[in-house]
Amino acid sequence: MEPKAFVEIMRPHNCILAGIVGILGSLVAYEGIPPVQKLILIFLVVYFGCSAGNTINDYFDVEIDKINRPNRPIPRGAITRKAAFYYGVLQYFIGLIIALLLGWSAFLFALGAYFLTFVYAWKLKPLPFIGNVTVALLTAATPIYGAVGVGRIDLAGYLAICAFLVNVSREIMKDIEDFEGDKRLGARTLPIMIGKKKSGIIASIFGFLTIISSFLPVKVGIGLGYLPIIIVDIMIAKASIDVLVNPEKAGKGQKILKFATFIAVISFLLGALTREV
């Protein structure tokens, strides 16, 4: 086994981004700077939930990854499947212990979200559209968790709406990208069930709904630091139009949405910090 595989299988860059979104949810909801120790705990709970979910996902997805992503740790033999499973369970356990430090509401929320990540990887992922929506719900739950961690929801709900919509779009694009491998293994993803073209239309609809939803925070007085969201909207529009015209561009489109999400996180953070309370 390769020691670096234990880091790689977590996909830390994705988990760091998720942790930042959790912190952002707390900042937006708190209308100020929450206690630093709470922000650290929120980040860690989200990080370990994300990393555990990624690890368990690779455990269940090993056959598909042999075709679609052969360079991932398990298919290339860098870590055994059994070791990956127990490693994922360990990460869940660490995250839940940390969640207890935030209180029972935060613990129960984390427990529910963690359970959903496991069930998604185990049973829900192959189901057409249901799997996509589940991932989007988990992503939307991230800023809400940050808000729960500081004891209020407030504006974090708007961030959750945007996160949900853009991730439904991205998950469908990823399924279009993985069409051949999924079809060979008998998966029942949305593109396989209704075709790439119709799936591209649905992905683009959710993309444009994200753009519309991105204006909701303006209505409630988010700060001028939110202006970079214009760049995000342009990127989402491009990805949505591309996949609408040519579904074969879904792979490029989902990467654009991933980068756009990163910029959106920064935009929401700056907007929250520059808002007049």
Swiss-Prot record:
Pfam family, one: UbiA
EC number: 2.5.1.42
Catalytic activity, as annotated: sn-3-O-(geranylgeranyl)glycerol 1-phosphate + (2E,6E,10E)-geranylgeranyl diphosphate = 2,3-bis-O-(geranylgeranyl)-sn-glycerol 1-phosphate + diphosphate
Predominant localisation class: membrane
Keywords, alphabetical: Cell membrane, Lipid biosynthesis, Lipid metabolism, Magnesium, Membrane, Phospholipid biosynthesis, Phospholipid metabolism, Transferase, Transmembrane, Transmembrane helix
Transmembrane segments annotated in the record for this chain: 16-36, 40-60, 93-113, 129-149, 153-173, 199-218, 222-244, 253-273
Pathway listed: Membrane lipid metabolism; glycerophospholipid metabolism
Compartments (UniProt record): Cell membrane
GO biological process: glycerophospholipid biosynthetic process
UniProt family annotation: Belongs to the UbiA prenyltransferase family. DGGGP synthase subfamily.
Alphabetical list of PANTHER family matching this protein: CHLOROPHYLL SYNTHASE (PTHR42723), CHLOROPHYLL SYNTHASE, CHLOROPLASTIC (PTHR42723:SF1)
Descriptive protein name: Digeranylgeranylglyceryl phosphate synthase
